[in-house]
Design a protein with these regions (language model features):
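Class I S-adenosyl-L-methionine-dependent methyltransferase catalytic core
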Residues: 1-177
């Protein structure tokens, strides 16, 4: 796992040493940031179900103004902190260790956000609610992105328009505005 582009290009990130985390592949992360390239500079980025922090750190490397990571697992939150330090981004990367459902119900540091990304476990049962609650963290004109299993039909929460879905192998990215 590495940072693909930007100021930290090529930097290797620490990976989890336990089962249960599914880091986004470098290929899918590259696809995501190719799509976001015109929006990322100066953006406020929210990474929900952050895992290793690789997506938030990629955003910072490519010019995002700041990133907030929400992660419930204490080991993963510690890993995000280690990776942010490795990338010299600890000062621009806020880590919230809390249950996602609770964290999204209150204003988060660094928000409102221009880009909100959710990468829940593929068997997560509350996609509709998670996407809808994450959307409340959006700045005006901001977007919400959901990474999910390509076999799953993406949710259509009230107040959001599904604008695009991109599939790569077993994974998909669905964009909402």
């Amino acid at each position: 796992m590495r940072i693909i582009s930007g100021t930290n290009k090529g930097r290797t990130l620490k990976a989890p040493k336990w089962d249960g985390l599914r880091p986004t592949s470098d290929k899918l992360r590259g696809t995501l940031f190719n799509i976001l390239q015109t929006r990322i500079a100066g953006a406020r980025f929210l990474d929900v179900f952050s895992g290793t922090g690789a997506i938030a750190l990629e955003a910072l490397s490519r010019g995002a103004a700041g990133a907030t990571c929400v992660e419930s697992d204490r080991r993963a939150a510690a890993l995000i902190s280690e990776n942010a330090t490795l990338c010299r981004e600890a000062d621009r990367c806020v880590i919230i260790r809390d249950v996602v459902e609770r964290a999204l119900l209150k204003p988060l540091p660094g928000g409102p956000f221009d880009i909100v990304l959710l990468d829940p476990p593929y068997d997560y049962a509350h996609l509709d609610a998670a996407v809808g609650n994450a959307a409340t963290q959006r700045a005006e004109g901001g977007i919400v992105i959901l990474e999910h299993a390509s076999r799953v039909i993406p949710p259509q929460p009230d107040g959001l328009a599904l604008t695009r879905t991109v599939t790569s192998g077993d994974s998909a990215l669905t964009f909402y505005s």
